[in-house]
């Protein structure tokens, strides 16, 4: 998987086949995007998934070192999706830091939330909760077992001016 957050590519490689080719393919991807006029400031590797153990691959994370290139100092960035602003921590967040594949589902939640009371379990960065609040939910409660995820969701709510309509709970929903 390669996700793009602003000017950073975040790669999560889970198979031997990709692992042995990453030193060629990841810089090539950055070069192709740059040739298209896009700014790419670095490639961050999130190779810390347990699935790598089953493939016999080492766990690790960090910037891909490409000779002659520098990468950003921060592993946090801000993105905007469907008019909602999010801080994304691609070093410590789940998977690559944000679930980009859920964009249309988040939009759907915004479209059905008006006037409702919403419970968002497993909130992570608060993405579904924020979309519900922006969609007109009367109140939203966002729950996650991770204190750092709850804190990121709080920050994202504040960034979008929604903290007065949302509660945040750090708890295991099971």
What are these regions (language model features)?
Residues 1-3, 21-98:
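Non-catalytic substrate-recognition/targeting regions of SAM-dependent transferases
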Residues 1-6, 116:
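Non-catalytic accessory regions of SAM-dependent methyltransferases
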Residues 8-13:
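Carbohydrate-binding surface patches
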Residues 16-19:
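Helix N-cap motif at beta-to-alpha junctions
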Residues 69-174:
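Rossmann-like S-adenosyl-L-methionine
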